Amino acid sequence: MASLRKTHPLLKIANDALVDLPTPSNISAWWNFGSLLGLCLISQILTGLFLAMHYTPDVESAFASVAHICRDVNFGWLIRNLHANGASFFFICIYFHIGRGLYYGSYLYKETWNIGVVLLLLVMMTAFVGYVLPWGQMSFWGATVITNLLSAVPYVGTTLVEWIWGGFSVDNATLTRFFAFHFLFPFVILAMTILHLLFLHETGSNNPIGLNSNADKISFHPYFSYKDLLGFAILLVALASLALFSPNLLGDPDNFTPANPMVTPPHIKPEWYFLFAYAILRSIPNKLGGVLALLASILVLMVVPFLHTSKQRTLTFRPVSQFLFWTLIADVAILTWIGGMPAEQPFIIIGQVASVLYFSLFLVFFPLAGWAENKILGWS
């Protein structure tokens, strides 16, 4: 008789996704990040739910309610620190996951990849509205600066900004709706994640050599379920260590000051995981141009599959493209550093050069390198 997990309508879906899933036998630890992102999402939803039980989305009491959570609620300080630093780990895992996809040509599964890019945008929006909720100085001014960018949209810009604000400045209406969005988006992300997996399981996983692995597949459980558990343990230990030993390491000291519309902080900057995009935004002296570049810095990922010129899928056997890939990683690191620096020389010019290089790598150098490698191998 067939086992219940293979016949029950609900269990069968879980079984096909987590137990009997045929998986390439040679996938490396870089394939762990998908499940780690699932863990991050569940962790963020749970800690966020408990925070929402005690948080007050009102300009008069938001800052005090966060202080109340940290001082008076049972383990509130821990829940808050896990949630704030969990966001950082979420983005670390996302960037590793995207890097893996770029290195091993996973973007050739176009539907899965494009849903992934939409997921990235959703997570970024969620993190942005979440950062506003403690109503500290950087929360308020970050919200003011970033929402103000929409005023660069021709003709309807100002109306659009005031519509999002719910008034003529960032105020109570803004905070209330941002809290509503921050509560809603994670569940949208959860639904999109299921779609992401659905499309992935249509094709099966890619693998480090990028060749068809149908002849050599093994079941996901127990081999990769246990491999994932090791990743879970490492992530949770790292998150707990950061949240317990140095919870404010990645935060901004300005956010310990309650929001004051009359005092502008000397350097307005977002959380570290947005700094690369912020640097690209700032490197263009025109407001609308900067906003378009900011959008393009993420949406450029959507054109990557269409610019794949190589006859090989992965970079495993392509040293020229490998060099370009690591140049891209270094470039993003430089942009992250520049994004946290004041807008003055020499940081402006470094940011502009790094921004041009960022787009050139995606749109020019990677396609050219793929074409050249085909030529060298006599495959063209």
From Swiss-Prot:
InterPro entries per record: Cyt_b/b6_C, Cyt_b/b6_C_sf, Cyt_b/b6_N, Cytb/b6-like_sf, Cytochrome_b, Cytochrome_b_C_euk/bac, Cytochrome_b_N_euk/bac, Di-haem_cyt_TM
Organism lineage string: Eukaryota, Metazoa, Chordata, Craniata, Vertebrata
Stored PROSITE patterns: CYTB_CTER, CYTB_NTER
Binding locations of heme b b566: 97, 196
Protein name in UniProt: Cytochrome b
Protein residues bound to heme b b562: 83, 182
GO cellular component: mitochondrial inner membrane; respiratory chain complex III
Species, as recorded: Sarda sarda (Atlantic bonito)
Bound cofactor: record note: Binds 2 heme b groups non-covalently.
Presence of the UniProt keyword Disulfide bond in the record: no
